[in-house]
Amino acid sequence: MLAGSAAVRLALLRRLVDFDLMATVTLKTIGADDVLWQWLPGPRGASDAHPYDNLWIRLVDLPRALAARGYEGSCDVVVDVTDELLPANAGTWRVTVAGGEAVVSPSTDAAEVRLGIAHLGSAWLGWGNLSAMHRAGVIAEERPGAVSDLWRAFRLDVAAWPSPGF
């Protein structure tokens, strides 16, 4: 359900759940940071709430993809990216973000973060938390604080919205 503002969206949803004969309301596409989650009375407020990952992305041209998106924070981090499908993406890159824009260039400096292209794609969407990935051991940090620096730059005020399907 799309609406012009969060207040309108919540008002429409409240109207739906307040109908006398309405036993359930089902929403198929809810973003990870949708205001609806704040409206529910805790994690058990929805009887069948579960994430559905129907929006995936494949970065094809890493430098252009990273330069094409906006950023909330800034960073200067050297990342080592693995990409078995597209060798042009693989390698060591310096990611410098300032003023909401990124400059990405090949680097011979020592890597500060090591991650796969899929993890970078998830962060590119703004919902793959790099700090959580690091804590889980799926990406590596060679310089203390480098993952946090990179994630602060990649975070967005509103995460990507899952598509309704194709």
PLM features: residue spans?
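Intrinsically disordered, low-complexity, positively biased terminal segments
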Residues: 1-166
